[in-house]
Design a protein with these regions (language model features):
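Hydrophobic alpha-helical transmembrane segments in multi-pass membrane proteins
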Residues: 4-173, 238-298
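Alpha-helical transmembrane segments of multi-pass integral membrane proteins
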Residues: 125-231
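Membrane-embedded alpha-helical segments of integral membrane proteins
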Residues: 119, 208, 213-217, 221-256
Length: 303
C-alpha cells in the first residue's frame, strides 16, 4: 500500500496521472485496431461499427467504473454510429452532446472532477492540438510535435480544474508525457490483448502482459524520477481564486502569442511592387550581415 501511494503521488506530481486511469485514448486505440482489421477483411462499414461498439462495451465493462469511462464510452458510441452511417466523426459535436446529455440525465456529474477533467482535456485537444502541432512542426519532428501539442493542449484546459483539486502546477508534465508517449500505445494494446486472451490462452496472455510490463516500467521510472524532483511542482493559490488566476495567465499568454504572430506576419508581408520580402523579415540575412560588418570593422577594412 505504501508503494502504491508513493507511485500515485509521483505520477500526479510528474503530470502523467492520466495514465493510471482509463481514458479516451484507450477507446481510440481499440477503435483503430478494429477499423484496420475491418479494412483488411474487407468488412462492411456497418459491421465494423457494430464490432467497434461491442469492443467499447466490453472494455467499459472490464474496467473499474468511472466518470471518465462514461464520457469516453458515450463519445465512442457516437463515433461508431457516425462510422456506420458513412459520416466523418465530429469530436467537438460528440463532446458537446455527451456533456449535455450526461448532465441532464445525472446532474450530480456536474460536481465530478473526473468528468470535468476528461471533458476539458478532450476539448483542449480537439480545439488546439492541430494548430499547436503545425506551429511546433516548424522546429520539431512531426511525431514529436504531435505528442507535445496534445500534451500542451490538454494541460491548458485542465490546469484550472487541477488547481481546484490540488493547489500546485506540474512543471515537468510536458517532458514527462514526451518520455512515456512512445510506450503508451504499445502497452495499452498488449495489455488489452492479455486481458482478452487470459481466459482461453493463458500462455499467450502472459507474453502480452510481459511485453506490456516493459512499457509500464518506463512509465514508473519516469514518474519516480521526475516526480521526486523538488522542481516538479510549483505551489499555487488554492480554490476558485487560484483557478481564476491560472485561467487569466493562460489567456494573457494566448493574447501575447496572437499579437506576436500578427506582428511577424505583418513584417513578413512582401512589399507592393517589389520582389521578395522586407529586409527585417529574414533573421538569417540580418545575422549574416551583422557578422560580415563586424568582421570588416574589426579587421580595419574600410573598402
Amino acid at each position: 500500500a505504501t508503494y502504491a501511494n508513493i507511485l500515485e503521488d509521483r505520477f500526479r506530481k510528474s503530470g502523467i496521472m492520466h495514465l493510471m486511469a482509463v481514458s479516451g485514448g484507450h477507446f481510440v486505440l481499440l477503435a483503430g485496431l478494429v477499423r484496420r482489421l475491418g479494412r483488411w477483411l474487407l468488412m462492411d462499414r456497418r459491421l465494423t461499427a457494430v464490432m467497434i461498439a461491442s469492443m467499447y462495451v466490453l472494455l467499459a465493462a472490464a474496467m473499474f467504473p468511472g466518470d471518465s469511462v462514461t464520457r469516453a464510452l458515450i463519445m465512442g458510441m457516437m463515433g461508431a454510429a457516425s462510422h456506420a452511417m458513412g459520416r466523418r466523426s465530429q469530436a467537438l459535436s460528440a463532446l458537446c452532446w455527451t456533456v449535455v446529455g450526461v448532465l441532464v440525465v445525472s446532474p450530480g456529474m456536474s460536481t465530478s472532477y473526473g468528468f470535468a477533467l476528461s471533458s476539458a482535456a478532450v476539448l483542449g485537444i480537439v480545439l488546439f492540438a492541430g494548430r499547436l502541432s503545425r506551429v511546433l512542426g516548424h522546429v520539431l519532428p512531426h511525431s514529436l510535435a504531435e505528442m507535445m501539442a496534445m500534451t500542451i493542449a490538454a494541460q491548458l484546459f485542465t490546469l484550472p480544474i487541477q488547481v481546484l483539486m490540488e493547489p500546485e502546477l506540474p512543471l515537468l508534465s510536458v517532458p514527462a508525457n514526451l518520455l512515456v508517449a512512445p510506450f503508451v500505445g504499445l502497452s495499452t494494446i498488449t495489455g488489452l490483448m492479455s486481458l482478452a486472451l487470459a481466459w482461453c490462452m493463458p500462455w499467450l496472455a502472459g507474453v502480452f502482459a510481459w511485453v506490456s510490463s516493459w512499457g509500464t516500467l518506463v512509465m514508473e521510472r519516469v514518474a519516480m524520477w521526475l516526480g521526486s524532483n523538488e522542481m516538479a511542482t510549483l505551489p499555487w493559490k488554492d480554490g476558485v481564486v487560484g483557478a481564476a488566476l491560472i485561467l487569466l495567465a493562460e489567456l494573457g499568454i494566448g493574447a501575447l502569442s496572437v499579437l506576436v504572430t500578427r506582428q511577424v506576419k505583418r513584417v513578413r508581408q512582401p512589399e507592393a511592387g517589389l520582389p521578395g520580402m522586407r529586409f527585417g523579415s529574414v533573421w538569417r540575412v540580418r545575422l549574416t550581415l551583422w557578422i560580415e560588418e563586424s568582421r570588416r570593422l574589426l579587421s580595419g577594412d574600410s573598402s
